[in-house]
Design a protein with these regions (language model features):
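Short, charge-rich amphipathic alpha-helices with coiled-coil/heptad character
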Residues: 1-9, 36
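Amphipathic, hydrophobic secondary-structure cores in small proteins
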Residues: 12-74
């Protein structure tokens, strides 16, 4: 095993850990948004901010997952 392989493995573990953390936060935001809309919260600004954060998390997760996908030379 080469040093570069170890670094790549460490990077992959870090990326997978970050993806997991972001997915948990995304899930928590979804639950919070659902709760606010269920109780009929009139704070649309807060709901909008939560939805925006949720979209940002989804985009970040997609970027990180793309880093784990090997490049295919066509």
């Amino acid at each position: 095993m080469h040093i570069n392989d170890n670094i790549n493995n460490i990077e992959e573990i870090a990326i997978r850990s970050e993806i997991l953390r972001l997915r948990l936060e995304h899930h928590d935001l979804e639950a919070a948004i659902d709760a606010l809309t269920t109780i009929g919260s009139i704070d649309q600004l807060q709901i909008g901010r939560l939805k925006k954060r949720k979209l940002l998390l989804r985009d970040r997760i997609a970027i990180l997952e793309d880093q784990l996908t090997p490049d295919i030379i066509a």
